[in-house]
From Swiss-Prot:
Biased composition (Low complexity): 1-15
InterPro entries, A to Z: Ankyrin_rpt, Ankyrin_rpt-contain_sf, Palmitoyltrfase_DHHC
Gene name of the encoded protein: akr1
Taxonomic source organism: Aspergillus oryzae (strain ATCC 42149 / RIB 40)
Membrane-related topology note: Multi-pass membrane protein
Catalytic site positions: C485
The protein's name in its UniProt record: Palmitoyltransferase akr1
Residue stretches spanning the membrane: 314-334, 335-355, 375-395, 402-422, 499-519, 549-569
Topology Cytoplasmic: residue spans: 1-313, 356-374, 423-498, 570-737
Pfam family, one: Ank_2
Key words of the record: Acyltransferase, ANK repeat, Endosome, Golgi apparatus, Lipoprotein, Membrane, Palmitate, Repeat, Transferase, Transmembrane, Transmembrane helix
Family: Belongs to the DHHC palmitoyltransferase family. AKR/ZDHHC17 subfamily.
Amino acid sequence: MSSGNSSTGTHTNGNFATLGSSPPSAVGGKGRAIPPKVTHEDASVELKTMNPERGAARGSIPLGEDIMQIARIGEVPAMQRLFDEKKFSANHKDEEGITPLHWAAINNQYAMCKFLLDSGADVNAKGGESVATPAMWAAQRCHYYIVHLLLQRGADPLLTDVQGYNILHLATIDGNAFLLVLLLHQEIPVDVVDQQGHTGLMWAAYKGYPALVDLFLRWGAHANAVDEGGLTPLHWALVKGSLPCVLKLIEYGADKFAKTRDGKTPAVVAGEMNTTRVWYRALDEYGYDLDGNAKVSSSGLASWVRNKSLMSKFFFLWPFAIVFAAVWILSNMVVYAAIPMMLVTVFGLQWVAQKAASQGPSEYRILQKTPYLSGVFAGSLFWVGFRYVFYVLPVTYSTSPILNGLFAIFFSLTTYFYIYSMVEDPGFVPKLGSRNQQRAVITELFEQWKFDEENFCVSCMVRRPLRSKHCKRCARCVAKHDHHCPWIDNCVGANNLRHFVLYITCLEVGIVLFVQLTFNYINSLPAPAQPQCNIINETLCDFVLRDTFTLVLDLWVCIQLVWITMLVAVQMIQISRNQTTYENMRGHSVDRSYPSSRAFASAVAAGTTSLNAAGLTSSGQGPNPALAQGAPRHRKHGCLQQWSSLLGIDTFFATARDGLRDGPRAVRPKNPFSRGVVTNCRDFWCDPAPYFGKREPGAAMLGGEVINYNRMYETPSRMHSGGGYQSLSVEDPEQGV
């Protein structure tokens, strides 16, 4: 399945004869019409590049008389003059059968293509050594607006070139998900094969395009289709060695024991292609041993560990035990032994959780992707409430009634808003009900020149409202996406942002009240008969030994006050600007870099200073779905580094270091959603949605008017200074969760 076409960047890998499948000839819908070198994405294709001899011959033709050059550069008036003078027709062909429409298509000259079609150009004319159509030429350059125009004008997507490739195969080889979405909605059979029996899914797997593999499988492609050599998509994925592709195929039921005509299983192919590590890792991810058989646990817990619902409850409740064990050890053992014993116990219990994660569902293989962190907070909240009800309240209810009343109120509010933020739909953009609806949306976006990653989500197949973002963790687009918060194991978006802010605000106040109550409680307890301490003085020893468990728990709560205070401050500032965390990251990335602000906001919002870990890439858009990337590189982080990020320790150093490098403060770009501090705050706190109860999905206020973020596709016309978000259409400098 090799390709000699450098312009499509096809990967040549291994001896294909050993796989029982000969590689197809050079992929290219244009034959010699393909430049021998990869041109820049915005570079036009020169005539001399296609055929140097003919290019030299054309050098003597005046530009005004050269129909092919005029088509290439898109000079519609010059083309009109040639037609008016009857020197050429729209269906003029050179000696290889190439038409002006071919040249206009490959150079992305939309106006010229439209003019030629209006002038009667044959949309299905074949030319070049590979006998390809203009649509095929455009597809290999990823000009999907040109492809859409040609399809509208009658281009046949099932036509093939001399090598048997249709436009779907060529688009897959190029690797653009948006072009593939367009073509699949043309009702092209998803499993249409080339001359050697390769389906589009096989090409996507071989090229290492996980986004396209996922798209084909969701569209119904056969995961166990075979080519002439008996190779399945799984075999081809292992030829490339793309772990995401292999994982996705196994997820959709690819046969792990399928044999080629030469009797080679995927395991054998992996060995021949030196991708055995990828194969073994993929098997382990889905609970299979090295032979591809389901793992059998000696303890008989395999079925329990694989149950996502059960494991979700385990990861949420397990930190309850960890918090209790840590506090109990620190409060009941001598300090010299307590600290190391506590560390050993905590790391041991966390190792149990990590071991369960490694054996559990594939999406839980990373502990931070489980409800574990939300369980840490819930466990802390539970033990604070337990200690308060059974120990603090009985002693202080008569001496501090107001303080107890306030704490009870804020503790209840914190619990309510925490649970609501965790279980509430954060603002998932509704999915479309049918492919016909998807096709209608795509057509509308093409008409508006908005069919791109900014306005359409390939994963959800929906039009993206303004301020929305696709969350990889939730696998959905979220309206007015703020961030994905591991402490509530949910996204924060249009529906639960206010509840989330109320949760952290009530938590902030509740912690302060609990600390005061704790000191009142300790002072009310009788002094121990014979206090004995080795480090602290007698007075402090007398105070600590009255109820060490409650004091240690109080210290743990105070630690949480650090990141809670930072988060509340960030959210309040962003509310005053009518700005989300996502927009804050994004606005600062467009030639206006504030490293300290990005590190700070990312850490307090999502538990890490890494924009990638926060789901906020340097442009804020996430991975570019238009570019079907290969396997991502994963950086390994130790336990201490992970926890330092989660507790905000590395944020302090990042803020201090980057703050020294920040240049003079530039003028902040205008925020199209800001209506001034007072109006922004009023819109957020006083919208019609109930504080206690479910709001209408996506409903909010902007400038005093009720809007719905699920259906807001146009930028508000009114512009005010403030905020840090300017453009809703910026290019992602990354590749492209």
